[in-house]
């Protein structure tokens, strides 16, 4: 059971400039503590069906959304700690199930269907999802630099800042070097506020006063939109030539 984690929370996203981030970091210092890992490089593989069903459902704004991903902290080795995550969103509430294992075992389970992760309730949910979404495979690599903080008085409150968000659709392997195409401008950061209940008043007041507004920004979703746009443009060029 120690290798399983279950989250239920609300997540709110904001796109910030470098100055906005700097000012907020200074303001929230009395309320938040830096995560013990400090600044991390987070590497992810998002899994999807051959027709990209999961991400299409997500960006179409369905009430129920689901994502399956493999995550490591930094470039992976076979024995690196890895997390297989099943992330569901229903009516704005995020439910995340996570299994911790070694990277090589995670790949064998997700890509080859081998029985390499411990049996548990979360494993059963993963098995069901893998059977439901036939032909599921790695679709997009995403990495980013993350700074994470948690509340001094409320440990369910987490605030993260993601920068240097990179994506690619080739070399879909977390043991490969960290590289890809950028999603954000150089001075931008994606802030995520994660709460188990209501947002604290000090944070609500700050966001309101500084006119910081929520966005529905999705890293995988924006990468997918770029893929579709470029495919359509390429198709249009070919039709024009013919």
Predicted stretch roles:
Residues 1-242:
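Phosphate-end processing signature that detects enzymes handling 5′-triphosphorylated RNA
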């Amino acid at each position: 059971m120690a290798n399983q984690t279950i989250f239920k929370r609300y997540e709110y996203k904001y796109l910030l400039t470098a100055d906005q981030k700097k000012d907020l970091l200074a303001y929230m210092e009395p309320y938040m503590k830096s995560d013990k890992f400090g600044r991390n490089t987070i590497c992810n593989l998002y899994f999807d069906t051959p027709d990209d069903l999961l991400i299409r459902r997500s960006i179409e704004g369905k009430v129920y959304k689901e994502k399956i991903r493999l995550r490591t902290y930094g470039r992976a080795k076979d024995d690196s700690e890895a997390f297989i995550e099943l992330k569901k969103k229903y009516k704005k509430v995020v439910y995340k199930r996570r299994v911790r294992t070694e990277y090589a075992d995670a790949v064998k389970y997700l890509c080859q269907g081998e029985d390499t992760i411990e049996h548990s309730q979360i494993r059963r949910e993963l098995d069901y999802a893998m059977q439901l979404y036939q032909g599921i495979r790695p679709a997009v690599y995403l990495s980013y630099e993350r700074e994470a903080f948690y509340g001094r008085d409320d440990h369910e409150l987490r605030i993260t800042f993601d920068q240097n968000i990179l994506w690619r659709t080739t070399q879909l392997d977390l043991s490969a070097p960290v590289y890809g195409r950028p999603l954000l401008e150089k001075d931008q950061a994606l802030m995520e506020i994660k709460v188990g209940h209501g947002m604290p008043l000090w944070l609500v007041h700050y966001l309101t006063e500084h006119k910081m507004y929520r966005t529905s920004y999705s890293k995988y979703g924006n990468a997918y939109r770029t893929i579709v746009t470029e495919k359509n443009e390429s198709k249009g060029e070919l039709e024009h030539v013919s």
